[in-house]
């Protein structure tokens, strides 16, 4: 099937509709001796202006909205995290939104409990980037570290970007709280964080790949068996 903006948006809408009722553990697969789970951190509701392609003809968008009974004014999307378990390693990719970001998010702790894990069981937290829905969850509502026993890992470029004193001056005004919040949480991790570069194997079987754009130092990860 050819992938174009309509099929992509339609697939996105279907995924949102499928998980309209929050589910704590969405999927689980085995990869060799490892297990990879997709777990929920809740859902976020965004205005339609941020969710739908503004260049799409209105007639095309209307068909998709009608097919899936969606509003053009807003779209609710699931926020999910990945958990990699192999041997004694329990590696969480990103830390979720925590309690301070938006209503409806921050269900990660409950999702872990649903698979008989606690935050103390997490051995490593690996960040893709430092936007609020990916890193604010490192602190709990007492500003203590959520994952007390974990080692933390983030790309060097991403770390440097949020610690650059000019970043807060360069972002849009409405994104200043995001920049300040990212730096505050990264500061809480100083002394217990591993900075890595693209192509580094940061944990046995997990290789980092630089994929900038969404953020300057955004990382993706290749997971081996």
Model regions and ranges:
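Active-site-proximal loop/helix segments of hydrolase catalytic cores
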Residues: 209-225
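N-terminal export signals
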Residues: 7-26
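Metallo-beta-lactamase
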Residues: 106, 113, 121, 148, ...
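Secretory targeting signals
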Residues: 1-3, 7
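Conserved beta-strand hairpin/beta-sheet module of binuclear metal-dependent hydrolase folds
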Residues: 28-115, 220-225
